[in-house]
């Protein structure tokens, strides 16, 4: 009847927790799978329930990311197929050609390890550990927020029944996040074409890899022979892998920058409450969107905005260098320009990893200054050559800055004259401003030879009205 009291969201939530954590296993598996965006496969859901119950009962401080690896590889297997001998031979030949061409375009030495060909499942399994490292700080923050929510809202009798609810919820929250991580990585395995496609080094720094199935699907959208696409992508991948092998500090720097950013994310209890009030717990689509969108992650702080800007600059420098080297190395390919444009459009649309980072750590990892960075690298190449350009990756302190991207000519001048001091740079900038007469204050000589030291008051002044007298001291 309409007048009968209906159980509220809190009642439903408490009942679900009670059944889950007490091991009764009476939760509707199809509803749980639908809310998490998971397939309603009985075997999978049974395994999921078992994992969540184990996580609740273990209550450890860490998070078991083996769940993420299992889920990622399961998704990657859907529609995936192994690399056949003909495709393997074609890819090997592409890597051989790419290595020869790349030797002419960069002084960065070749890899010692043989390039690999990954299936989607192999890529998912190989990269999940790094994804887990990146996402773990946020997973812990979400687990802690859920723990706080339960401690503040659960009735005393429920707390007593659950025992150490904090540890239980920390385990369950971590397991749920690990499942979501597996979802993201598994879906990503169907989109990436190479090991460096994400922009962040997810594989060992000495490994270059292509995903032949995804390369073929990428080539389907182009009016370009697949062999050319394969060679072009092999060049990009080798350039990316060579850079990270040569600049051994670079991989650790980028991964550490992301994890340090993620550690600054603290999800407050009121954010959990706010999100709970906005979502209808019976609406599986809303619940799934909340899990997949990273809605729990709060807005960035000023410190995080600054850290993100630095990280985006470094990613732009990496991708800009790869673009510059790839363009030079693939000049022989008739359709290299068309392939490069497709790569740029794909990246401008967000790329295969942007939504993944946004979901997992609230990062919009897009090298926004890529074109400017590539132009800067090209300027350095034209003026100083490939060896001096590539030597800039030898140490973090030698890498160009955001200011160098803005002023490549000044950067090149400084590289030509490394002994110049900061005062010299300041003097050069002031002299350049004066010669360019950016302010209009440079003294001018008229036709009679008279020097006007106040040109702003002269006849060239386009402003209307009487001119102000010169009151400056002589």
Feature locations, PLM:
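Extreme N-terminal leader/anchor segments
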Residues: 78-93
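Auxiliary, metal-adjacent structural segments of Zn-dependent hydrolase domains
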Residues: 91-213
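Long amphipathic alpha-helical segments used for membrane anchoring, targeting, substrate engagement
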Residues: 1-65, 154-172, 417, 422-446, ...
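Active-site recognition of the HExxH zinc-binding catalytic motif
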Residues: 228-248, 377
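Short pre-active-site segment immediately N-terminal to the catalytic Zn-binding motif
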Residues: 173-176, 215-233
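A short mid-domain helix/strand-loop element embedded in enzyme catalytic domains
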Residues: 201-216, 284-301
């Amino acid at each position: 009847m309409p007048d009968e009291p209906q159980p509220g969201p809190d009642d439903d939530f408490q009942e679900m927790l009670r059944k889950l954590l007490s091991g009764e296993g009476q939760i509707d598996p199809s509803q749980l799978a639908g809310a998490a965006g998971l397939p309603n496969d009985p075997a999978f859901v049974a395994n999921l329930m078992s994992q969540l119950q184990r996580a609740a009962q273990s209550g450890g401080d860490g998070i078991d990311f083996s769940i993420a690896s299992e889920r990622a590889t399961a998704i990657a297997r859907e529609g995936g197929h192994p690399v056949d001998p003909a495709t393997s031979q074609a890819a090997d030949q592409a890597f051989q050609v790419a290595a020869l061409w790349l030797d002419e375009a960069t002084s960065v030495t070749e890899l010692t390890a043989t390039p690999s060909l990954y299936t989607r499942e192999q890529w998912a399994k190989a990269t999940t550990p790094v994804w887990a490292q990146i996402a773990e700080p946020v997973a812990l923050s979400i687990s802690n927020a859920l723990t706080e929510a339960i401690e503040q809202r659960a009735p005393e009798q429920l707390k007593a029944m659950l025992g150490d609810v904090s540890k239980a919820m920390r385990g369950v929250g971590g397991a749920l996040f690990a499942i979501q991580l597996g979802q993201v990585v598994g879906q990503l395995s169907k989109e990436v074409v190479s090991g460096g496609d994400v922009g962040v080094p997810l594989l060992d720094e000495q490994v270059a890899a292509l995903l032949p199935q995804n390369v073929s699907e990428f080539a389907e959208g182009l009016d370009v022979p697949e062999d050319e696409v394969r060679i072009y992508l092999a060049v990009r991948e080798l350039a990316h892998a060579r850079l990270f092998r040569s600049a051994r500090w670079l991989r650790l720097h980028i991964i550490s920058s992301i994890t340090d950013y993620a550690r600054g994310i603290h999800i407050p209890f009121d954010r959990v409450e706010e999100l709970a009030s906005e979502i209808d717990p019976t609406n599986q689509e809303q619940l799934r969107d909340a899990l997949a969108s990273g809605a729990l992650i709060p807005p960035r702080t000023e410190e995080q905005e600054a850290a993100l800007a630095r990280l985006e600059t470094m990613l732009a420098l990496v991708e800009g260098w790869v673009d510059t080297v790839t363009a030079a190395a693939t000049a022989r390919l008739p359709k290299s320009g068309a392939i490069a444009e497709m790569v740029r459009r794909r990246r401008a649309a967000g790329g295969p990893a942007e939504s993944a980072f946004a979901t997992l750590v609230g990062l919009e990892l897009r090298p926004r200054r890529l074109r400017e960075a590539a132009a800067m690298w090209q300027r350095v190449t034209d003026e100083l050559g490939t060896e001096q350009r590539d030597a800039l990756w030898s140490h973090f302190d030698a890498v160009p800055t955001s200011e160098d991207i803005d002023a490549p000519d000044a950067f090149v001048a400084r590289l030509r004259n490394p002994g110049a001091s900061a005062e010299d740079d300041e003097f050069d900038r002031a002299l350049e401003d004066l010669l360019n007469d950016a302010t209009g204050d440079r003294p001018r000589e008229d036709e009679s030879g008279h020097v006007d030291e106040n040109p702003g008051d002269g006849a060239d002044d386009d402003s209307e009205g009487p001119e102000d007298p010169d009151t400056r001291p002589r």
